[in-house]
Curated annotation (Swiss-Prot):
Residues 325-364 have a biased composition (Acidic residues). It is found in: Nucleus. Residues 101-110 have a biased composition (Basic and acidic residues). One of its GO terms (molecular function) is zinc ion binding. Residues 14-95 form the GIY-YIG domain. It is an enzyme of class 3 (hydrolase). Transmembrane segments: none annotated. This is Structure-specific endonuclease subunit slx1. Forms a heterodimer with slx4. SUPFAM superfamilies: GIY-YIG endonuclease. GO terms for biological process: double-strand break repair via homologous recombination. Keywords: DNA damage, DNA recombination, DNA repair, Endonuclease, Hydrolase, Metal-binding, Nuclease, Nucleus, Zinc, Zinc-finger.
Length: 364
């Protein structure tokens, strides 16, 4: 590889999301971001250290994760979206008329607020969902590979009710889905602490350690190491993997390779958006299957920059010997609590000092 391609940085994160928590009494909400929703929910509910101070206030636990927004290309991108979602009265990502309405609410709230009260206007759940819908459609975030996943059916129903009234719809590449978080059927004598610390399996099962693209990475590395001469699927010229940024079709049965610049131009041409610089999706020049640009870029960054991450991903993790067995059980994937744990820092408690309780009265 040439010196120009030696990039001393980490690959794109395996996973990063923004989330909306709701407290047990359903009068308080929290917006945050994390690379590991299951671990973060445990922090908020006190099963591990690192949760924001505000979320540990008396009477607020247990917290439930009602929905997440996924697809952020970096931690800083998620923090940017998180701040905008928390501060719709101040962010420039929201249209001026919407922002001014939020400011009016803020000024009304300040008149009766004590000096120690927080500076954000009170918001209902409906308002938070409206703000989320606004953010998903603004130019700043409209080309990010974002998706929304709901865990609380009643929150999803309120979202559906809201978008049914909207004149504009989100772009088709944004998927909105409901995967209900089933609460356990615990016996009456189960301690309240156990109930508080419960993390739904649907949240635990979210892939946060590159395990979802492991087969794709294996296929790409095998394709590039087979010694065969390959031509770019777009320009048809020879592909030099040591000097070029090369993208591989993620389709299991397709071995198409392309220069990143060539495939980018092809995808943008298919989209016919002259103002766009980064594609969202397109079709493989060989198998013609639809491909998400973000999937290929994540695989490329992991393959080129993730030496340590790849070692962890492909290393067989040993467990302790079980009783009456002669062999060790193994775990195919790395411990998600170890991978990228340094990215999941304690939340900034000053943010929560400026968050209000829910206002049950919907605001126009």
């Amino acid at each position: 590889m040439t010196d120009g391609l030696k990039i001393d940085s980490r690959p794109l994160p395996a996973f990063y999301c923004c989330y909306l928590l709701r407290s047990k009494n359903r009068k308080a909400f929290y917006i945050g971001s994390t690379p590991n929703p299951a671990r973060r929910l445990g922090q908020h509910n006190g099963s591990s250290k690192g949760g924001a101070k505000r979320t540990s206030m008396q009477g607020k636990r247990p917290w439930e994760m009602t929905c997440i927004v996924t697809g952020f290309p970096s931690r800083f991108a998620a923090l940017q979206f998180e701040w905008a979602w928390q501060n719709t009265h101040a962010t420039r990502h929201i249209e001026r008329d919407v922002r001014e309405a939020r400011k009016d609410e803020l000024e009304k709230g300040r008149k009766n607020a004590s000096p120690v009260k927080r500076s954000r206007p009170p918001m209902s759940l409906e308002a938070r969902l409206k703000n989320l819908h606004h953010l998903l459609g603004v130019g700043s975030f409209s080309r990010w590979p974002l998706h929304v996943r709901f865990f609380a059916p009643d929150v999803f129903s309120q979202w559906e009710k809201h978008i049914s009234k909207m004149n504009t719809s989100l772009r088709k590449s944004i998927t909105i889905r409901l995967t209900p978080a089933e609460l356990p059927k615990l016996a009456p004598d189960v301690s309240s602490e156990m109930r508080t610390h419960f993390i739904p399996e649907v949240i635990r099962a979210i892939p946060v350690a590159y395990e979802d693209i492991k087969p794709y990475v294996e296929k790409s590395m095998s394709t590039l190491r087979d010694g065969k001469t390959r031509d770019c699927g777009v320009c048809k010229k020879d592909v030099n993997v040591d000097r070029s940024l090369v993208l591989i079709c993620p389709n299991e049965t397709c071995c198409s390779v392309s220069h990143m610049s060539c495939l980018s131009q092809r995808f943008l041409a298919e989209e016919a958006n002259k103002e766009a610089f980064i594609p969202i999706e397109g079709t493989c020049p060989s198998c013609h299957s639809p491909i998400k640009w973000s999937d290929m870029i994540k695989e490329l960054s992991l393959r080129m920059r993730g030496e340590d991450e790849l070692k962890t991903l492909f290393k067989t993790k040993r467990k302790k010997k079980q009783v009456d067995t002669t062999e060790d059980d193994t775990d195919e994937y790395p411990d998600i609590d170890d991978l990228n744990a340094d990215l999941d820092e304690d939340l900034d408690e000053t943010w929560m000092e400026n968050v209000n309780e829910e206002d049950d009265k919907p605001r126009s």
